[in-house]
Amino acid sequence: MLNDHLRSMIYDKYIKPTENRRDTYAGIEIELPIINLGGKATDHTVSRAAMNSAVSHFGFQPLKYDDDGNLHEAQDPVTGDLFSFDCSYNNFEMSFARSQNLNDVDDRFRRYIEYLNKNLILNNHLISGFGITPYYRLCRKDYIGYAE
């Protein structure tokens, strides 16, 4: 009798909730290095200009600025995607809002990267997906200063 009661309690707590169909979502965050193709440190003015251009082009809304008034986070009001410089202007971060369709996220990612790199290459920079910048020793180590 007690065994049946315990079995029923365990079933109700752990198994029964899995029987209900739930929607499945994925949230993706990607942080990619901005590389100076001249073998030098990343030029932060180039990084910031590329973000400002992408924010304007894709209709993102500015959210946060650093202590010097530079934009470092913006959000798409339709998709909820975020562009940001999390800790430094050496890496560009894209945070995609939760989605049930990874192909939609992939399409947006490709559009963002293509646009950003078309702008960055004009200043001999590029967003790379191959780990850290090979010139990390040359890059400035200062963090973005801002008050929350």
Residue ranges with predicted function:
Residues M1-E148:
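Terminal catalytic/cofactor-binding subdomain
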